Amino acid sequence: MTAPGFVEFPDSPFHLYQPYPPAGDQPGAIDALTEGVSDGLMFQTLLGVTGSGKTYTMANMIARLGRPALVLAPNKTLAAQLYAEMREFFPRNAVEYFVSYYDYYQPEAYVPTRDLFIEKDSSINEHIEQMRLSATKSLLERRDTVIVGTVSCIYGIGNPGDYHAMVLILRTGDRISRREVLARLVAMQYTRNDADFTRGVFRVRGETIDIFPAESPELALRLTLFDDEIESLELFDPLTGRVRQKLPRFTVYPGSHYVTPRETVLRAIETIKEELRERLAQLIADGKLVEAQRLEQRTRFDLEMLQELGFCKGIENYSRHLSGAAPGEPPPTLIDYLPADALMFIDESHVTIGQLGGMYRGDRSRKETLVQYGFRLPSALDNRPLRLEEFEARMRQCVFVSATPAAYEQEHADNVVEQVVRPTGLVDPIVEVRPAHTQVDDLLGEIHKRAALQERVLVTTLTKRMAEDLTDFLSEHGVRVRYLHSDIDTVERVEIIRDLRLGVFDVLVGISLLREGLDIPEVSLVAILDADKEGFLRSERSLIQTIGRAARNLNGRAILYADRITDSMRRAIDETERRRAKQIQHNTDHGITARGVSKAVRELIDGVVAPAGHDALESAVPAEVLTDEKAMAREIRRLEKLMMDHARNLEFEQAAAARDALNALKSRLLLDGVG
C-alpha cells in the first residue's frame, strides 16, 4: 500500500492529501466523472453507497480538474462533516464554510386575523459570519478554493460588483491620508472602537491604525502612516500584540456582504421615493388609508436612515433598488461569486434538490401579506431566495451525489457513475423480512444477541408514540436504550450518537432521523418496524437509506418487519441484493477480505471526551478546586459560562465536554456533601 502523502496534478493549484490510494469503485468513478466534466457534460450522478468514500472521490475530482468547487449539503450537520473531511484532504488550500449565520431567526410577518405584526428578530453567529466573508474573499482571490455550504447559498448576499469595488488595497509606499483611510473603513461598514478591538472594528492611535478584518479568524492588520504615506503593514495577534508578519501589500475586504457605494445609495433613495409615490397613490385609490399611512411612515424613516448612515434596519428589502435590478429579477447570491468554470457537487441530492425548490414559495407567501397591508413596498418581494429554474440557469457543471437518486437527478443526469464497491471490502447488509405481528418480541431477542457481542442496534418506528412505548418496553426488559426525536437539539443529538458509539447504551430508537449521513460503524443491526406501511417513511429511498446504516459493520444485517412485501420493499431489497452481489463478486475476483471500519469516536464529533466520571473530572479540574467549597462554586460558574459560550458559537462538542465536566462537578458536590 502506498504511504500517505500529498499528490499534485498538472495545471492544478490543489495539493491533495491522500491517506490511501483510491480503491474499490473509486478509481473508476474518479476517471469517469473527470472525463465527463472534461467532455463538457452539464449534469452527472455519482450513485455511491454508504461507506464507499464519496467525499474522497469528490476531492480527487476537484484536485485533478484544478477548478474552484461548491459542495452543497442538505443541513448544517452534514455540511460540517463534509467541511472537516475536505479540510483533511486539502490542508494547504482554501476550504471554506458557507451556511446560514443565524443562531435564531424570526422573519418579520403580519397575521391579518389578529392584526399582529411580528418584528424581525435574529441572533447572528459571529464565527459563521466571519467564515462566510472568508468564503467570498477566497473566491475573489484564489483558484484553489472549495466551499462547503447549504441551501443558504441561494439567498441574496449583495452584489459581487459592489462588494469588489469597495475593497481597500493598501501598499507600502502608497500615498493616502489618515482621514481618507478612516472614511473608507466607515463606508465599508467597519466600526471605530478604541476600547473593544474585535472583528469588523478599527482603532486609531496617532498615525497608527489597527484594523481587524471582518473575514479574519485571528490576525489583525497594523497600518503605520508617516506624512500621508504608508510606512509599514504588519499582521499581528490582537491578544498578545506580537507581530506575526510584515507585508508589502494587503487587501481589506468590506465588513459585510451588503456594503454599497455612497452614489449607489443616493440613486436608490430616489427610486425608492418614486416607488413609494406610486404605491401610495394605488393604496389611496383602493381606499386603504391605514395601509397608506403605515407604509409612508415606515418607508420615510428608512429613507432618512439611508440618507444619513448609508444603511437601515431591513435594508435587504430595498436590495432591488440598491442593485439596480429590474422588477422580478433574481437577487445576487453566492453562486454569482463563483467563476464560470467552477464545479458543483450536490450531496444527498435527493433531499437537497427538494429544499432548493421549496425555499422560494414559503418566502413569497409571507412577503405578499406584508406588501398587501402596507408594511413593505412591492419591491421587497424581490429580496428572496432563487427559484429552482433560476438556480438551474446559474448552475455550473454539476455532480449529483446520492445513494438513492430521485426523479430530478434521473431526468437530468447525462452520465450515471456507480460507486458500489467499498475500499474496505465491506458488503451491503443481509436483508431479512419477518412477520410484523411478533415484531417486538423478536426484536428483543435480536437485541440481546447483539448486546452480548458489544454491537449496537438502530430501530426505526413510524410514530413518536410507538417510539416512546417501545423505548419504555425495552427499558423495562433490561435493555440500555435511548430515543432520538425531532425535539432533541443538535448538541444533545450529537451527544446521543457519541454515547451509542462509546457503548453507554446499546439501542437507539428513532423515526426518520436515522437515515442520511449517520456514520456509526458499531451498528450491526437495523430493525425497521411496520416496513409494509407504504408512505414517505417506508418509500424505496427511505428503506435503502435506513438499511445502509448497517453497511459499515462486518456483521451488518437489516430486518424488515412486515406481514406483506410492498412494491417499495421489493425494490429496496432487490437493489440492496444487486449491490451486495456486485460487492461480493469484486471481493472474490480480487482476493479481498472485508474488514470492519475502525473509526475513532472523536472523528465523528471532534473534541468530545469520554463520559466524565471522577477520573475525567480530576484530570480536567485542579485538585485544590475539588477540596475547596468556594473554589468549586467558582469553577461551576466558569464551566456554565464556558458551556453557553461554546453553544452560542455552535461549538457543540466543546459545549458537551464542558457540560460533562459541570455535571461531574455537581455530582461530586452532592456525593461529598460539600456546599
Curated annotation (Swiss-Prot):
GO molecular function: ATP binding; ATP hydrolysis activity; DNA binding; excinuclease ABC activity
Residue window of motif Beta-hairpin: 101-124
BP GO annotations: nucleotide-excision repair; SOS response
GO annotation, cellular component aspect: cytoplasm; excinuclease repair complex
Top-rank taxon: Bacteria
Domain UVR, chain residue ranges per copy: 633-668
Sequence positions that bind ATP: G48, V49, T50, G51, S52, G53, K54, T55
Record's subcellular location: Cytoplasm
NCBIfam families in alphabetical order: PRK05298.1, uvrb
Role summary: The UvrABC repair system catalyzes the recognition and processing of DNA lesions. A damage recognition complex composed of 2 UvrA and 2 UvrB subunits scans DNA for abnormalities. Upon binding of the UvrA(2)B(2) complex to a putative damaged site, the DNA wraps around one UvrB monomer. DNA wrap is dependent on ATP binding by UvrB and probably causes local melting of the DNA helix, facilitating insertion of UvrB beta-hairpin between the DNA strands. Then UvrB probes one DNA strand for the presence of a lesion.
Name of this protein: UvrABC system protein B
Species whose genome carries this gene: Bordetella parapertussis (strain 12822 / ATCC BAA-587 / NCTC 13253)
Name of the gene: uvrB
